[in-house]
């Protein structure tokens, strides 16, 4: 059974080996789920001085009564560690709710989890740790890994200049969450721990049971926190964006029907179009200015190029010449080979790249992330323009 930090402190009083050993202090982000719970427990077991931190994100969500907050607080009590809730509703509203809404209004398909990771979750955790002064590290339950640059010495990666800390895929390829972390900085990586990075999901559940964690049997959440809060992404959109009628038009120019807002559509969508045609049609593109949803045959959805903007180079120094990468253009897709070319003729030349795929790709979706890998190493990523 897991010993609490309270028990370990008593042990240390009688251990001559620990008299000169200084514990590292770490803040663990706790959602109340099994992954973050196990992360905290494993760090306690390894001898870290742990404090749990839960972000209060949603307006209309009480700080004392949501299931996640209650489970996080209970877990910390079980482990004998401190637990803190900080009110992050304003920054979440500004950086996630507002920006997600604006993206849908522009006809984009945003990635709220990435927005949250970049501007809310890790920022809030790191600032909290820094303000406490004696806390040096932060941790989350993400399935991803961090390595030092020496990791690449035996790899064929001569075309890249690596930074000190590298972000890697999680060992469990089915649970890997590195795609959502492409916006992290070296400062964050230097202080960040992923206790579950080397584990498989089934091992996580077994470990949680072994340690007797109260969240060990808790079902895994499959949805975005926005979906969990609003019930569906459709309800989120309806609450934040006014309907505006427009046309659904075939790419050949024929009007096939009407819609009540481009925010309800995404590139590649087939279901819910409400139109009649001899064979299945898919959303090809969204024209915000004309408020038109363009549809086409599936064969018309394929493209070999995309412009990637707001690129963040996580693990390597920004390349000045074209490089070969493995690009992932949606969370559950497999990475595909491509060439990334810096663009010199756009307003912000250091942040815009042309991505040319080796083979045609279907439904390249504006607003989603294109994340670049070399094997397991996440090089960087940006937004599909």
Swiss-Prot record:
What family is this protein classified in?
Answer: Belongs to the MnmA/TRMU family.
Q: Look up keyword RNA-binding and say if it applies.
A: yes
The chemistry this enzyme catalyses reads: S-sulfanyl-L-cysteinyl-[protein] + uridine(34) in tRNA + AH2 + ATP = 2-thiouridine(34) in tRNA + L-cysteinyl-[protein] + A + AMP + diphosphate + H(+)
According to its UniProt record, which residues of this chain constitute the active site? Answer: 116, 225
Biological function: Catalyzes the 2-thiolation of uridine at the wobble position (U34) of tRNA, leading to the formation of s(2)U34.
Its recorded name reads tRNA-specific 2-thiouridylase MnmA
Protein's cellular compartments = Cytoplasm
Example of a GO biological process term: tRNA wobble position uridine thiolation
What high-level taxonomic lineage is stated for the organism? Bacteria, Bacillati, Cyanobacteriota, Cyanophyceae, Synechococcales
Which residues does the UniProt site feature Interaction with tRNA point to? 142, 368
Region Interaction with tRNA: start-end pairs = 175-177, 330-331
| Binding-site residues, ATP | 29-36, 55, 141
What's the superkingdom here? Bacteria
Q: Which SUPFAM superfamilies match?
A: Adenine nucleotide alpha hydrolases-like
Assigned GO CC terms = cytoplasm
Query: Which Pfam families does the UniProt record give?
Result: tRNA_Me_trans, tRNA_Me_trans_C, tRNA_Me_trans_M
Q: Which CDD domains match?
A: MnmA_TRMU-like
| Class of this enzyme | transferase
Q: Which organism is it from?
A: Prochlorococcus marinus (strain MIT 9215)
The terms under GO molecular function for this entry are: ATP binding; tRNA binding; tRNA-uridine 2-sulfurtransferase activity
For this chain, the annotated S-S bridges are 116-225
């Amino acid at each position: 059974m897991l010993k609490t930090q309270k028990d370990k402190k008593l042990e240390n009083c009688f251990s001559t080996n620990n008299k000169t050993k200084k514990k590292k202090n770490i803040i663990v982000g706790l959602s109340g789920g099994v992954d973050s719970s196990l992360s905290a427990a494993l760090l306690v077991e390894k001898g870290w001085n742990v404090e749990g931190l839960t972000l209060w994100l949603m307006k209309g969500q009480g700080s004392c009564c949501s299931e996640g907050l209650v489970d996080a607080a209970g877990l910390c009590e079980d482990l004998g560690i401190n637990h803190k809730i900080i009110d992050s509703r304003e920054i979440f509203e500004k950086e996630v709710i507002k920006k997600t809404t604006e993206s849908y209004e522009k006809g984009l398909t945003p990635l709220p989890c990435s927005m949250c990771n970049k501007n809310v979750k890790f920022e809030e955790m790191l600032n909290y740790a820094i303000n406490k002064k004696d806390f040096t590290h932060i941790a989350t339950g993400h399935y991803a890994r961090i390595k030092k640059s020496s990791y690449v010495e035996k790899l064929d990666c001569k075309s890249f200049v690596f930074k000190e800390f590298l972000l890697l895929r999680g060992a469990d390829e089915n649970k890997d969450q590195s795609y959502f972390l492409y916006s992290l900085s070296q400062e964050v990586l230097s202080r960040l721990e992923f206790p579950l990075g080397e584990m498989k999901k089934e091992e996580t559940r077994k470990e949680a049971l072994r340690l007797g964690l109260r969240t060990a049997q808790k079902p895994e959440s499959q949805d975005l926190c926005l979906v969990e809060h609003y019930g569906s992404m459709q309800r989120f959109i309806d609450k934040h964006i006014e309907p505006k009628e427009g046309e659904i038009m075939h790419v050949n120019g024929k009007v096939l029907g009407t819609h009540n807002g481009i925010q309800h559509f995404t590139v590649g969508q087939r279901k819910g179009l409400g139109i009649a045609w001899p064979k299945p049609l898919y959303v090809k593109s969204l024209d915000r200015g004309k408020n038109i949803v363009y549809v086409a045959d599936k064969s018309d959805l394929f493209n070999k190029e995309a412009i990637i903007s707001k690129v963040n180079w996580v693990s390597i120094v920004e390349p000045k010449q074209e490089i070969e990468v493995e690009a992932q253009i949606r969370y559950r897709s497999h990475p595909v080979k491509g060439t990334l070319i810096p663009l010199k003729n756009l307003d912000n030349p250091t942040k815009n790249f042309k991505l040319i795929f080796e083979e045609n790709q279907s439904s390249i979706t504006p607003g989603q992330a294109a994340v670049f890998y070399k094997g397991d190493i996440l090089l960087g990523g940006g937004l599909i323009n």
